[in-house]
């Protein structure tokens, strides 16, 4: 749980205000007043703008220094590090991407040490192990991290089987795993659709659904899914890159 220390409102408001000052055109979510930190993390996710990410990372590290036992702060830091990973992968900077995924893993594992009942944290950990496979030599990284992906997704599902992030991560597991080790494109589509049934606003999940349809050979459904993603988040370079790859 988040700390109730008196310094928190000022720090959280500062984090969100700093992001809005960097991206003044970004609309403030309705929930920003109730959860300024969550709103700041979501604003950074939508754009993957590096200055936003750097500002938010600095704010989170300051909060963690003052509240080192707050599991939620470590989870937010892990998310921000994953967004850095996306940025570096887009640039094809494999070294920086490798450092970012390791930092994300460290933060997420610390979150789970403090609170092992977070479905979001276990789900993110599964995704990060999957990213380790994609960044490494699949012949060696697959056997090392593949079982961990499956284990963390199972933990997340046991904790919250109505969580859209949990279903999306399971979909990525089915999509990215080789068929001989349990990969299943049809199950990945089913999982992504289940995620979207719980939360239809998840643009990234629609991109992954498009990737599944593309792998299945259904380009029409792939284009439709990614067009919905672009409509939901037109400012995301990751979404735009996915759309371009399907054209």
Task: Locate each region found by the language model.
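N-terminal leader/linker segments that initiate helical-solenoid repeat arrays
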Residues: 26-87, 91
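Short coil/turn linking the two alpha-helices of tandem helical-hairpin repeats
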Residues: 47, 83-92, 126, 131-141, ...
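Structural signature of tandem alpha-helical TPR/SEL1-like repeats
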Residues: 52-55, 91-106, 136-154, 181-194, ...
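Canonical positions in the second alpha-helix
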Residues: 63, 111, 155-156, 194-195, ...
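Structural marker of alpha-solenoid helical repeat scaffolds
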Residues: 66, 114, 159, 197-198, ...
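Helix-start (N-cap) detector for alpha-helical repeat units in TPR-like alpha-solenoids
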Residues: 71-72, 119-120, 164-165, 203-204, ...
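Terminal, low-structured helical/coil segments at or just beyond the last alpha-helical repeat
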Residues: 204, 208-211, 215-247
């Amino acid at each position: 749980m988040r700390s109730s220390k008196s310094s928190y409102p000022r720090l959280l408001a500062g984090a969100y205000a700093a992001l809005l000052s960097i991206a003044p055109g970004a609309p403030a979510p309705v929930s920003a007043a109730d959860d300024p930190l969550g709103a700041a993390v979501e604003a950074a996710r939508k754009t993957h703008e590096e200055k936003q990410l750097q500002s938010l990372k600095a704010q989170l590290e300051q909060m963690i220094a003052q509240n080192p036992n707050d599991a939620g702060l470590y989870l937010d830091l892990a998310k921000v590090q994953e967004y850095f990973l996306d940025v570096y992968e887009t640039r094809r900077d494999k070294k920086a991407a490798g450092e970012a995924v390791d930092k994300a893993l460290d933060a997420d594992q610390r979150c789970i040490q403090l609170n092992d009942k977070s479905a979001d944290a276990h789900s993110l950990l599964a995704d990060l192990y999957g990213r380790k496979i994609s960044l490494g030599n699949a012949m060696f990284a697959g056997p090392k991290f593949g079982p961990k992906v499956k284990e963390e997704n199972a933990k997340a599902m046991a904790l919250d089987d109505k969580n859209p992030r949990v279903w999306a991560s399971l979909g990525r597991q089915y999509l990215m795993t080789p068929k001989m080790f349990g990969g299943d494109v049809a199950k990945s589509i089913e999982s992504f659709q289940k995620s979207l049934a719980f939360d239809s606003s998840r643009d990234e999940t629609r991109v992954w659904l498009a990737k599944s349809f593309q792998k299945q050979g259904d380009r029409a459904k792939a284009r439709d899914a990614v067009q919905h993603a672009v409509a939901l988040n037109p400012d995301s370079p990751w979404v735009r890159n996915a759309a371009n790859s399907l054209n």
